[in-house]
């Protein structure tokens, strides 16, 4: 039986997307105008979905895990160059966690078809976005209510996130149109296949 494993090329891609997540968390450091009501926007959902659509479920999820663990270990890769456990305990900590199942689910849905259509890319992107916001917003509500002790309703929490969700949904739609071409270019140049972990 052939054993499926990650090769050096797989690990390089995983590391690259973990690094892109760090860049996405702090995009306002180079583009300070990317804010809504004084709150910095993040490109992390975009890079999370891009990882899922290009790398597939397992590699993308591993990339998100690596990103979370690197930050938890003390590297300043989270928003506002924060690190450690504190960002997980904050109101946006749920989004850091959500990237893992979102990347896996979007990648898994895409892998159900060897040659997925743009519609399938779109649905995969929307599935990933929905998971991010379901987990992230619910976590934010619980954090505010249970340990930050800020009285807020679940509906208010969703209302606060609506503009961010609109932005990330729009980016997901755009991504679903450009990701197929990017993947085909990578596949043609390297033979990379998102549906399979390298085997020996």
Swiss-Prot record:
Membrane topology classification: Multi-pass membrane protein
Q: Does the keyword Transmembrane helix apply?
A: yes
Q: Name one GO molecular function term.
A: biotin transmembrane transporter activity
Q: Which GO terms describe its cellular component?
A: plasma membrane
TM helices/strands, residue ranges: 13-33, 36-56, 61-81, 90-110, 121-141, 158-178
Q: Which keywords describe this protein according to UniProt?
A: Cell membrane, Membrane, Transmembrane, Transmembrane helix, Transport
Q: Where found in the cell?
A: Cell membrane
Task of the protein: Putative biotin transporter.
Family indicated by similarity: Belongs to the BioY family.
Its protein name is: Putative biotin transporter BioYB
Q: Which organism is it from?
A: Bacillus subtilis (strain 168)
């Amino acid at each position: 039986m052939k054993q499926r494993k990650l090769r050096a090329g797989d690990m390089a891609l995983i590391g690259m997307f973990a690094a892109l997540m760090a860049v996405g968390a702090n995009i306002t450091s180079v583009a300070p105008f990317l804010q809504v009501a004084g709150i910095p926007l993040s490109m992390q959902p975009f890079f999370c979905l891009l990882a899922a659509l290009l790398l597939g479920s397992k590699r993308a999820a591993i990339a998100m895990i690596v990103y979370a663990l690197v930050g938890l270990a003390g590297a300043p890769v989270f928003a506002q160059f924060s690190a450690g456990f504190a960002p997980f305990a904050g109101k946006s900590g749920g989004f850091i966690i959500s990237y893992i199942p979102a990347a896996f689910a979007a990648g898994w849905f895409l892998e159900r078809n060897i040659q997925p259509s743009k519609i399938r890319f779109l649905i995969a992107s929307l599935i990933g976005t929905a998971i991010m916001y379901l987990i992230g917003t619910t976590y934010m509500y619980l954090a505010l209510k249970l340990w930050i002790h800020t009285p807020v309703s679940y509906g208010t929490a969703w209302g606060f996130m609506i503009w961010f969700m609109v932005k990330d949904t729009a980016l997901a739609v755009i991504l679903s149109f450009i990701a197929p071409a990017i993947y085909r270019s990578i596949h043609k140049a390297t033979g990379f296949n998102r549906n399979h972990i390298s085997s020996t």
